[in-house]
């Protein structure tokens, strides 16, 4: 390997690592959550106490603009749609169409299980009633995140949807980016707020009273669940209000891992790593390969490509950061082990037998099979969802989908005979846990005196419970 490597090397060859050692070897970004918590708590408290007045103050402080309208007027959304570039509109509408098709297939069906005559347990899937969807701003504009949040929520049957997204510094009126507003209009979402950051999360969690006539008495009602990605402050705010409302996940910086063997195209690998690094200086780009030759060629391709991409400075910082690297392995099995330990948000598999590799992948937010399924396809147009678990949480968490916006609720339906068959056993169980009233409430339906423990078995026999 050259001493002038673009990305650092993590060499696992010849090493037999324990599970803990493998997890420790994976490249990760420093999150700084303690510092973020100290900054976010006062924001949450202020929005809870002062509502829209606090939201305007924070917009002025962080976004350098004081919006007249925190809730985007309907005419502004219509104007944004009318002004939208036809080619961009066509792309957005195609993305929506594909995402709707996939989301429709995800809607779970109710089912029931008959355990005996008169003994049924059913399961219903009920939509969350009101959801707050956060769409980030910052270094880029993300109309795609509008689609990825709204479409599965609509497919789930969510009754009330609200979107919060930061005001655009390009708009003197303090409204969000026009492409985001146009996307909301295409999707039929009319409750949109020009509010970003931790203060948007506070608004969703606690609601916000109005402070100016155009706000009304109540600017925003509280929601039941908050979804959508954001920066460290948004993620921290979501974590801090979790329990007051539901959240989808606490997202960290975006990331990609690529499992590649000697047959992969190094130029494409380099382009894919750069594509993810473009998001943020803390974005993670990781190549996992058993081919030192591929690793060398990717390093050389990066040296050629990075200076030529528009956001070269950001990409350079990301690729050279501690959260990125090239992991060298002894073979495909160790590459798979490393990928499962890293648990990437996006995992590309560019190997001779991708299906054999994918069959052994346990941990990934989404898997992109083969060289013609790059991550940006999933970001925009594949029909899959791009709101995915990050920072290793794909070991236990899943990406956004219809299920995110629904709750399974069991319905227990026993008739008299169904309960009678189990009454004595329920009572025995309850007594073993020293919760006799549990058993007594069941026995009360069949015997006269469930509190007379001296005659309980006799009463059960007379009632046909034994």
Give each language-model segment a name:
Residues 189-284:
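Conserved NAD(P)+-binding/catalytic subdomain of aldehyde/semialdehyde dehydrogenases
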Residues 113-182:
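Conserved small-residue-rich beta-alpha loop and adjacent elements
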Residues 249-322, 326:
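A conserved active-site cap/scaffold subdomain adjacent to cofactor or substrate pockets
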Residues 111-115, 133, 163-165, 191-197, ...:
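General beta-strand structural signal in soluble alpha/beta enzymes
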Residues 341-465:
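C-terminal core of ALDH-fold dehydrogenases
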Residues 2-129:
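N-terminal Rossmann-like NAD(P)+-binding subdomain of aldehyde/semialdehyde dehydrogenases
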Residues 6-15, 191-196, 326-331:
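Short acidic-hydrophobic, aromatic-tinged amphipathic segments that line or gate anion-handling sites
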């Amino acid at each position: 390997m050259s001493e002038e490597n673009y990305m650092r090397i993590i060499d696992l060859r010849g090493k037999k690592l324990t599970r803990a050692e493998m997890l420790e070897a994976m490249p990760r970004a420093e999150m700084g959550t303690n510092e973020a918590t100290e900054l976010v708590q006062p924001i949450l408290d202020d929005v809870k106490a002062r509502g829209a007045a606090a939201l305007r103050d924070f917009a002025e402080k962080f976004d350098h603009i004081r919006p007249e309208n925190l809730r985007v007027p309907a005419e502004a959304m219509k104007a944004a749609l009318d002004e939208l570039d036809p080619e961009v509109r066509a792309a957005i509408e195609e993305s929506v169409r594909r995402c709707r098709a996939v989301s429709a297939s995800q809607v779970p069906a109710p089912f029931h299980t008959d355990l005996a005559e008169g003994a049924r347990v059913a399961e219903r899937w009920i939509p969350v009633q009101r959801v707050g969807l956060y769409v980030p701003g910052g270094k880029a504009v993300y109309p795609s995140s509008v689609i990825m949040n709204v479409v599965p929520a609509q497919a789930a049957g969510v009754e009330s949807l609200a979107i919060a997204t930061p005001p655009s510094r390009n708009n003197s009126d303090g409204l969000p980016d026009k492409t985001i507003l146009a996307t909301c209009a295409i999707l039929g979402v009319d409750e949109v707020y020009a509010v970003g950051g931790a203060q948007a999360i506070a608004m969703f969690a606690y609601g916000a009273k109005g402070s100016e006539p155009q706000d009304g008495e109540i600017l925003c009602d509280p929601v039941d669940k908050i979804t959508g990605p954001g920066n460290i402050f948004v993620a921290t705010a979501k974590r801090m209000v979790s329990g007051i409302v539901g959240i989808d996940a606490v997202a960290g910086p975006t990331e990609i891992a690529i499992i590649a063997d000697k047959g992969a195209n190094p130029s494409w690998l380099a382009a894919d790593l750069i594509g993810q690094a473009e998001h943020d200086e803390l974005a993670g780009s990781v190549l996992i390969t058993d081919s030192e030759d591929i690793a060398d060629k990717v390093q050389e391709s990066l040296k050629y490509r990075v200076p030529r991409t528009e956001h070269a400075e950001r990409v350079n910082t990301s690729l050279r950061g501690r959260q990125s690297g090239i992991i060298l392995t002894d073979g495909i099995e160790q590459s798979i082990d490393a990928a499962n330990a890293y648990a990437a948000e996006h995992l590309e598999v560019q190997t001779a037998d991708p299906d054999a590799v994918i069959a052994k992948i346990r941990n990934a937010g989404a898997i992109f099979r083969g060289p013609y399924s790059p991550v940006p396809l999933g970001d925009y147009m594949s029909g899959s969802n791009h709101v995915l678990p990050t920072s290793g949480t794909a070991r236990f968490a899943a990406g956004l989908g219809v299920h995110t916006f629904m709750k399974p609720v069991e319905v227990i339906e026993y008739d008299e005979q169904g309960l009678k068959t189990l009454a004595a056993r329920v009572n025995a169980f309850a007594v073993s846990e020293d919760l006799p009233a549990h058993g007594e409430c069941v026995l009360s339906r069949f015997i006269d005196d469930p509190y007379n423990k001296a005659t309980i078995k006799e009463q059960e026999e007379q009632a046909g419970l034994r």
